[in-house]
Amino acid sequence: MGGLVYFSSGSGNTARFVTRLGLPAGRIPISPRDEMPAPALPYVLICPTYADGMGRGAVPKQVIRFLNDPDRRALLRGVIATGNRNFGATYALAGRVISDKCNVPVLYRFELAGTDLDISRVQAGLAKFWGTECLTMA
């Protein structure tokens, strides 16, 4: 199975979701002074959305900084997005933005810290996703 990398702000919603998943994961730090995780294997990114009403700023700056590194970006295989449905069209927009920019699929979207059903679906979905992923280079 591949890895997980996530970003969670001070609210901790994404961190709570990842903890409930029960899978090892690297955390992108809030502070730019802290060291970024260095994935050694392909990974799925879990990312919250912070868009304004027009969709600007959907991807947190820390995540942009993380993905701007070519070695880290090369190992990205998919994205799981989170957001708040109160924001309508910008709900989980960070997932679509990352998907488009990095040419990876949006694997799932959930609201805030997710539900027990979201946890079950993501656990099963990741097991299936990594079961079909070829980890060797062609």
Curated annotation (Swiss-Prot):
Which organism's genome codes for this protein? Paracoccus denitrificans (strain Pd 1222)
In terms of Pfam families, this protein maps to:
Flavodoxin_NdrI
Question: What protein family does this chain belong to?
Answer: Belongs to the NrdI family.
| Organism domain of life | Bacteria
GO terms classed as biological process:
protein modification process
Instruction: Output the InterPro entries linked to this UniProt entry.
Output: Flavoprotein-like_sf, RNR_Ib_NrdI_bac, RNR_NrdI
Q: Which gene encodes it?
A: nrdI
**One GO MF term attached to the UniProt entry:** FMN binding
PANTHER family reported in the protein's UniProt record: PROTEIN NRDI
What is the protein's name according to its record? Answer: Protein NrdI
Q: What does this protein do?
A: Probably involved in ribonucleotide reductase function.
